[in-house]
Amino acid sequence: MSETLLNPYFGEFGGMYVPEILMPVLKNLEKAFVEAQQDPTFKETFLDLLKNYAGRPTALTRCRNLTQGSKTKLYLKREDLLHGGAHKTNQVLGQILLAKRMGKTRIIAETGAGQHGVATALACAMLGMPCQIYMGAKDVERQSPNVFRMRLMGANVTAVTKGSASLKDACCEAMRDWAENYEHTHYLLGTAAGPHPFPTIVREFQKIIGEETKQQILAREGRLPDAVIAAVGGGSNAIGMFNDFIEETSVRLIGVEPAGKGIATGQHGAPLGHGTTGIYFGMKAPLMQTPDGQIEESYSISAGLDFPSVGPQHAHLQAIGRAQYESITDDEALSAFQALARHEGIIPALESAHALAYALKLIQRQPEKEQLLVVNLSGRGDKDIFTVDRILSQKGVSYAPF
């Protein structure tokens, strides 16, 4: 590990646990990334794409209706307004620029909810790169609008039927492809997890979320928030929000994992709260696993949070007490999803609804407390409307006009 340019670990978590054939590939990627970060032209090109193609900066919106009856001020960082519909577009643009700089001619990616796949497909279309997307067959079925979007933009989408046919299996398939085709192919990993240097690369391309949020909240309120809250699957939207606040110790960092059908049922995706440390997906990190080390299936109503592990920097932030990680059930996320749509006219992604649900819990616990909260609304909910409609119909929920 001493041969790496950057520290591959966050405390005890992280590392490069990959087949020997991929070690030089990862080190070349790290070298190219370090050089690109020192190149003003690369940075200018990246920031120009974020501004004039993706639509940054994104808005910071105050929720005036959801907080009625309390003394809380609640703001949403509107990554749902980014081109592509989620925060994923930020780091995808950065990684594809990096791949082109390295002379790669093909992009592969995994996707769960389909948002990373859509972001990869749109950026590949615009930057002229062939694109192969791996997606669990279960997710292909529940995220059909995003599958159509990817194919419309020229991506080849492969439904992975192995294992549980979910995100972790798509990740494994993408890694296999990369091991066979690394000479001309870049694996555009979609979250702040996996082997070094991916967690660092993804964080650096996502940190603009927190940088903008800090500037915007200071301009609006004249002070830093009491807490920033973000959903955590692999952890990219959360680390993008948290990064600029880590040194601001007055700001609580709250990550929200999926409790699924309830932690006690075992059907959840909360490795930070209820996992044990293991080796998975090229890294050492908290993991949902059996006592003998077999990977357990994660579960969430949200495809993008349905992942049995988490990025190593989140594990480190938890270990040193800088960030706290809570969990929200499917039902709580569904309630927040409906509340935001009904009272603010914003339809969030189910992933983002988990973060919002925890913020609403904080408000309900202490309505008289004056507090300033920011939720990272990491994506829009267009992709989830059919899932939500089906579930609410089964529950007998009807939609009545005001």
UniProtKB/Swiss-Prot annotation:
Keyword Nucleotide-binding belongs to the record: no
Cofactor annotation: pyridoxal 5'-phosphate
Molecular function via GO: tryptophan synthase activity
CDD domains in UniProt: Trp-synth_B
Pathway(s) it belongs to: Amino-acid biosynthesis; L-tryptophan biosynthesis; L-tryptophan from chorismate: step 5/5
Documented EC number(s): 4.2.1.20
Family under the similarity heading: Belongs to the TrpB family.
Subunit structure: Tetramer of two alpha and two beta chains.
Annotated function: The beta subunit is responsible for the synthesis of L-tryptophan from indole and L-serine.
Name of the featured protein: Tryptophan synthase beta chain
